């Protein structure tokens, strides 16, 4: 395993509270402190602080984010700070996911349906590959990192080392490749496949798009190994020896598979006896039919659809024992940074119960064996046993993190940019819509943006319609909008294609929009989750990246949460102003690129192989996409992509595969245009 040092590339030096926070965290880690909090306000450079801590400690790190959007944003930033090190991205690879489920009340079985994002799958493989081959690794992950992934021991054991001069016949290598889930395809050469031409075998590893390995044989010996461009065949360089990692994280050798299949049959027999003794013959027949079909597929192909449901048997685990996950791929001394910990920690704790509830019904009614319950996310207690030293990062850390850290807190209140927390003003609810309309018009005239939060979906919809009727360009952000469309709407706001964004619970953490100079909170005096002290402080922070930032609370009374949030904001504002005066700094609005956080994801997935997709370029895609049918705005393009995805899935269900392939290629082309837009 390569032991390379982290090298931080930046023209900036730590300033403000950053040097003290970095020194305090590094010292605590050196003294073995297990849990601590980095309490940093919006715009104070928490990511820069974390990067400096990683570089100083020189240990592998996991950055845990609460959603894909924030994970992509962090991945982008860490790649820029550590260009010479392995910064990888690990989130759910599903573009669309409908889990398997059963509704007893209506006797409705819902089959699993999903669409896997090939780019994200490649990046997941790149993440585990990096962890097994080097130590200078930063993985930015979502809560997907606590879901079952397959044993790292089996994964590492089944690698295929190849070396020039090695006695290794082509037939033996092809057999090994098939065992670790590579597929032979002499016509459609893409990631996870290999092809053979005479005495030459070429393979694209699961963690690459842009490079393939060419292995040349002389008899039963490996004569030469080269890296090639999979599209053009151009030789990029010679390789003395290399290692090919499995194409799936759920791999197993033949002996282990035979043992697992025997265990599955034993469990099936036991479960069938239970059903028969309870006279549940329908469930018994259903389970036997489904399980035997899976076993036949495993016997013939080495895997089956939904093989992860048998992961307990494949791993040789006891009933109830937690599965392996990404955390098990890290060395024991890794560092964990939990971003937006007040959201992420409860999210980690909630995953197990939701998954268990759905699968218990499938098991009870004979759709799955009881062992399927052990293909699950970690319980919170299991998560805690797998993590090492942890830094919880938030502007509003939760009670659990504060208790866990026992008062070990590094505060980061000063913003190096000099930006102060926004002025907070309380106004009465009487006439609030007209007052808000005037404020929005004033901001639009200055080419500034406005965020408005409401308590209900109905109110958000009505307000959006009213403001639109009054001549403002306004968009509505709600929970039904997927990640890509949400980013398109935010980009439209930043570009000035709309002036106002209305939402409910989506305008808090992680929205980095420097163009926003006004945040307006309606019904601010309605105590509850959306109007708690932490929620209010987070929402205030959306106006903290603009020198003219201001917050208006519409309320008839000042609640305890409002008072606490305003007092804390005032404290931070005063401290920043004092620092600015002492250092002669004039606050200036942040200037930020209009690139989306996902730009780095797609560029990383196709780096060095622009336009190659799955190794075929854009040959099957239409030469020109008719933009007139959906418009040119990012929001319209995102909606059109969703429409095409629905049509693609419908075509696949109807076995119209050529049409589905054409739609798929149109979607790829549109996604590229959306990123470039």
UniProtKB/Swiss-Prot annotation:
Q: Which GO terms describe its cellular component?
A: cytoplasm; excinuclease repair complex
Could you tell me which residue ranges the UVR domain spans?
638-673
Source domain of life: Bacteria
Location of the protein in the cell: Cytoplasm
Q: Where is the Helicase C-terminal domain?
A: 432-594
Q: Which GO terms describe its biological process?
A: nucleotide-excision repair; SOS response
Motif Beta-hairpin per record, residues: 93-116
Q: Which GO terms describe its molecular function?
A: ATP binding; ATP hydrolysis activity; DNA binding; excinuclease ABC activity; helicase activity
Annotated keywords: ATP-binding, Cytoplasm, DNA damage, DNA excision, DNA repair, Excision nuclease, Helicase, Hydrolase, Nucleotide-binding, SOS response
Q: Where is the Helicase ATP-binding domain?
A: 27-192
Entries under Pfam families matching the protein: Helicase_C (PF00271), ResIII (PF04851), UVR (PF02151), UvrB (PF12344), UvrB_inter (PF17757)
Q: Which residues bind ATP?
A: 40-47
Q: What is its main location?
A: cytoplasm
What role is this protein assigned?
The UvrABC repair system catalyzes the recognition and processing of DNA lesions. A damage recognition complex composed of 2 UvrA and 2 UvrB subunits scans DNA for abnormalities. Upon binding of the UvrA(2)B(2) complex to a putative damaged site, the DNA wraps around one UvrB monomer. DNA wrap is dependent on ATP binding by UvrB and probably causes local melting of the DNA helix, facilitating insertion of UvrB beta-hairpin between the DNA strands. Then UvrB probes one DNA strand for the presence of a lesion.
What does the record's free text say on domains? The beta-hairpin motif is involved in DNA binding.
Family affiliation: Belongs to the UvrB family.
Q: Its quaternary structure?
A: Forms a heterotetramer with UvrA during the search for lesions. Interacts with UvrC in an incision complex.
Q: What is this protein called?
A: UvrABC system protein B
Which species is listed as the source? Nitratidesulfovibrio vulgaris (strain DP4)
The taxonomic lineage of its organism, from the top, reads: Bacteria, Pseudomonadati, Thermodesulfobacteriota, Desulfovibrionia, Desulfovibrionales
């Amino acid at each position: 395993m390569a032991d390379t040092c982290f090298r931080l590339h930046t023209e900036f030096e730590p300033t403000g509270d950053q040097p003290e926070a970095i020194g305090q965290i590094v010292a605590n880690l050196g003294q073995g402190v297990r849990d601590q909090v980095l309490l940093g306000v919006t715009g104070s450079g928490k990511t820069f602080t974390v990067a400096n801590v990683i570089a100083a400690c020189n240990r592998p790190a996991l950055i845990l984010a609460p959603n894909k959007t924030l994970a992509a944003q962090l991945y982008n930033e860490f790649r820029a700070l550590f260009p010479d090190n392995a910064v990888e991205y690990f989130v759910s690879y599903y573009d669309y996911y409908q889990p398997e489920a059963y509704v007893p009340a209506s006797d409705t079985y819902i089959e699993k349906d999903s669409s896997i994002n090939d780019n994200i799958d490649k990046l997941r493989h790149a993440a585990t590959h990096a962890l097994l081959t080097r130590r200078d690794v930063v993985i930015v992950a979502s809560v997907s990192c606590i879901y079952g992934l397959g044993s790292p021991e089996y994964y590492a054991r089944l690698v295929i080392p190849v070396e020039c001069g090695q006695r290794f016949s082509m037939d033996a290598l092809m057999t090994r490749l098939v065992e670790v889930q590579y597929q032979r395809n002499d016509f459609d050469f893409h990631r996870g496949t290999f092809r053979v031409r005479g005495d030459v075998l070429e393979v694209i590893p699961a963690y690459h798009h842009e490079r393939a390995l060419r292995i040349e044989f002389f008899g039963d010996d490996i004569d030469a190994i080269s890296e090639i461009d999979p599209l053009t065949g151009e030789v990029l360089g010679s390789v003395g020896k290399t290692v090919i990692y499995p194409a799936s994280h759920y791999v197993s050798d033949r002996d282990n598979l035979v043992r697992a299949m025997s265990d599955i049959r034993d469990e099936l027999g036991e479960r069938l006896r239970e059903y028969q003794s309870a006279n549940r013959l329908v469930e018994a027949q259903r389970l036997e039919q489904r399980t035997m079909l899976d076993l036949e597929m495993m016997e013939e192909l080495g895997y089956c659809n939904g093989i992860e449901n048998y992961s307990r048997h494949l791993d040789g685990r006891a009933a109830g024992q937690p599965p392996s996950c990404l955390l098990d791929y890290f060395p024991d001394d890794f560092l964990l940074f939990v971003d937006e910990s007040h959201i992420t920690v409860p999210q980690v704790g909630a995953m197990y119960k939701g998954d268990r509830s759905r699968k218990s019904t499938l098991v009870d009614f004979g759709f799955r064996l009881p062992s399927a319950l052990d293909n699950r996310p970690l319980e919170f207690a299991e998560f805690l046993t797998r993590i090492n030293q942890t830094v919880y990062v938030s502007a509003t850390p939760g009670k659990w993190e504060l208790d866990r850290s026992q008062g070990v807190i590094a505060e980061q209140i000063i913003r190096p940019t000099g930006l102060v927390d926004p002025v907070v003003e309380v106004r009465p609810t009487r006439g609030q819509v007209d007052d808000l309309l005037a404020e929005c018009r004033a901001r639009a005239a200055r080419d500034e943006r406005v965020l408005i939060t409401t308590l209900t979906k109905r109110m958000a919809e009505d307000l959006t319609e009213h403001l639109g009727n009054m001549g403002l360009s306004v968009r509505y952000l709600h929970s039904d909008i997927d990640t890509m469309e949400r980013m398109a709407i935010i980009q439209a706001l930043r570009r000035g294609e709309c002036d106002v964004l209305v939402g409910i619970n989506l305008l808090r953490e992680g929205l980095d929009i420097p163009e926003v100079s006004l945040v307006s909170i309606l019904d601010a005096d309605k105590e509850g989750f959306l109007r708690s002290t932490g929620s209010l402080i987070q929402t205030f922070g959306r106006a903290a990246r603009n020198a003219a930032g201001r917050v208006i609370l519409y309320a008839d009374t000042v609640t305890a949460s409002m008072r606490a949030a305003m007092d804390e904001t005032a404290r931070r504002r005063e401290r920043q102003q004092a620092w600015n005066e002492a250092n002669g700094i004039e606050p200036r609005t942040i200037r930020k690129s209009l690139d989306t956080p996902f730009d780095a994801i797609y560029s990383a997935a196709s780096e060095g192989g622009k336009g190659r997709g799955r190794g075929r370029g854009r040959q099957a895609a239409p030469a020109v996409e008719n933009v007139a049918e959906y418009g040119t705005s990012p929001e319209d393009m995102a909606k059109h992509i969703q429409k095409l995805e629905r049509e693609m899935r419908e075509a696949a269900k109807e076995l119209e595969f050529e049409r589905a392939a054409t739609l798929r290629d149109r979607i790829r082309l549109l996604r590229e245009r959306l990123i470039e837009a």
